[in-house]
Design a protein with these regions (language model features):
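Extracellular adhesion/carbohydrate-binding repeat motifs centered on closely spaced tryptophans
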Residues: 1-178
Length: 178
C-alpha cells in the first residue's frame, strides 16, 4: 500500500512538498529518499542556493533539526529540513558539512576559504575531531605526533601571541608547548 495526497479538487497531487512530506511524479509519498527541490524562499539571493536537498525518512517525514546517517556518512538537516552545508554551528559546536553537492560531515584537516565572495580570499586550515567538531582555540593540540595551535578554529602559522601559564584560566585551554 502507498500513501497519496489528494488536493481540494480530489485529484492526486504530484511532485510537491506538502508540509513535511513529499509526493513524487506518480503522487506517491516518498520514503527513505533524497529529494532536491528548487529554492522557492529567496531564489534571487546570492547567499542562498538554487535548490535544497531534503531527506524523507521511513515514515515519509523530512528530517528536521537532526543528524541522519546514510551510507556511513553523517548529514545534518536544519529546522527547515534543508541539508546543512559549509561551516555550521550545531548545539554550540562548529562542523564542516561539505558543499551543496555532497553535504556530509568532515573529520580531520580541511582547508577553507575565509570569504569565498571576496576577490583574493585567503585560505586557512581547520581541524575537525573524529566526532566532527572543529577544534576552536587550543594552544597544544597534538595531531599525528605534532603539536598545533588553533585560534578561532584556524591553524596558526608565523608569529603567534600565546598566553603564559599564569594567563591561562580557561579549563579548556592548555599551556603552550614551546
Amino acid at each position: 500500500r502507498d500513501w497519496f495526497y489528494l488536493g481540494e479538487d480530489g485529484q492526486i497531487v504530484k511532485n510537491a512538498k506538502i508540509d513535511e512530506y513529499y509526493v513524487d511524479d506518480e503522487g506517491k509519498m516518498v520514503t527513505n529518499a533524497w529529494v532536491e527541490l528548487k529554492n522557492e524562499e529567496d531564489p534571487d539571493s546570492p547567499e542562498t542556493p538554487d535548490a535544497f536537498w531534503y531527506y524523507f525518512e521511513k515514515d515519509g517525514k523530512s528530517a528536521v533539526s537532526k543528524w541522519v546517517k546514510f551510507d556511513s556518512r553523517w548529514y545534518y538537516f536544519d529546522e527547515a529540513g534543508h541539508m546543512a552545508t559549509g561551516k555550521t554551528e550545531i548545539d554550540g559546536a562548529t562542523y564542516y558539512l561539505g558543499t551543496e553537492k555532497d553535504g556530509f560531515m568532515r573529520t580531520g584537516w580541511v582547508r577553507l576559504e575565509e570569504n569565498s565572495h571576496a576577490p583574493g580570499a585567503s585560505e586557512s586550515w581547520y581541524y575537525f575531531n573524529s566526532d566532527g567538531k572543529m577544534v576552536t582555540t587550543q594552544y597544544d593540540k597534538k595531531i599525528d605526533g605534532s603539536y598545533y595551535t588553533f585560534i578561532d578554529g584556524k591553524m596558526q602559522t608565523g608569529w603567534v601571541l600565546m598566553p603564559s601559564k599564569s594567563d591561562v584560566t580557561d579549563s579548556n585551554a592548555a599551556s603552550p608547548k614551546i
